[in-house]
């Protein structure tokens, strides 16, 4: 399945919420009418079955983190095999992706831009170049922008934007050095309350 490259607003309208696919320079409401579904009948959102609700939640989370269907299924299987709550394990695996950590540290204005930085070998982990967006970052790992990319305007702008919106507590960043530490894997209480991971567990448990 190919990665979606179409209008970001369409995805946000489909899920009826901000998926954080845009930089956040302007409020999402000023760009997308997220209250209305896409299409000619977008003003009307029909009633959903339990399955439909579960599927929409899975699609929402998958799109937030920019993960393809097969990857997402793999993460779920890995999460189910771990000790603890499967839903929480799933979200933690997604949060530990290198592209997501780069985004959380503020080196990219969106997860898509952060994924591109990783793919273009602009990011290092513990001093070693890593170009795999799905690489799992561990507590204590040092994630940094490589010297060759430090002066990129988009990275400077992304850091400014992150300073405005605030940085999550589980990363510590030196903006001058463009380097950060992934202090710990976030607990469920640290993550978005707008995600109902139990619906995803119910979907995969069918």
Curated annotation (Swiss-Prot):
One of its GO terms (cellular component) is small ribosomal subunit. Residues 96-156 form the S4 RNA-binding domain. GO terms for biological process: ribosomal small subunit biogenesis; translation. It comes from the Bacteria. GO terms for molecular function: rRNA binding; structural constituent of ribosome. Keywords: Ribonucleoprotein, Ribosomal protein, RNA-binding, rRNA-binding. Belongs to the universal ribosomal protein uS4 family. Part of the 30S ribosomal subunit. Contacts protein S5. The interaction surface between S4 and S5 is involved in control of translational fidelity. One of the primary rRNA binding proteins, it binds directly to 16S rRNA where it nucleates assembly of the body of the 30S subunit. With S5 and S12 plays an important role in translational accuracy. This is Small ribosomal subunit protein uS4.
